[in-house]
Amino acid sequence: ASAEGGIYKFLSDNLFGLLKADPKCTVFIRAALNCANASIEKVKPAMERLSDIASDKFVVGEENFVESPAGHQLLKKIIIQDKIRHSEGGHTFSKMLLDQLNAKNSLESYIGCNRGAFLLVTIMETGVPSLQQLVKDCLKQYGKALGAQSTRGAELLVQKLNLHK
């Protein structure tokens, strides 16, 4: 357990650099953040750091974390695990991410790109009612922007929002 604290502190302190250094680092990051045996209090700072990085505004089509294959897969796999985290009473990455997206007014970046919209669909598919409601609440003001998108991710997101009214 003593190594656990050091590993997660290293991860929190160096997450951005690891993500930039090599996309393959996402495999380690995903394993660390989704580790069933890790203390949530040790994992939480790294999840908060990842949500901070993932919630930065970006221009669709330009190099960014959300649209990169490795970044998208990392976020998707961590969001999927939120169903388990929630059932165990832990902090969910999805809530951290949505809170950051709201605080930074960067939800439009997610809505405007296929992979970003798919990540919001993935949050809806966790089956966690509080997360589903949070997505709906966050997206209320973006109805027109979402409706104007022609990506498959945006289409599915509109369907999910209508299914969960």
Labelled PLM ranges:
Residues A1-K165:
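Eukaryotic gene-expression regulator signature that favors modular helical reader/repeat domains
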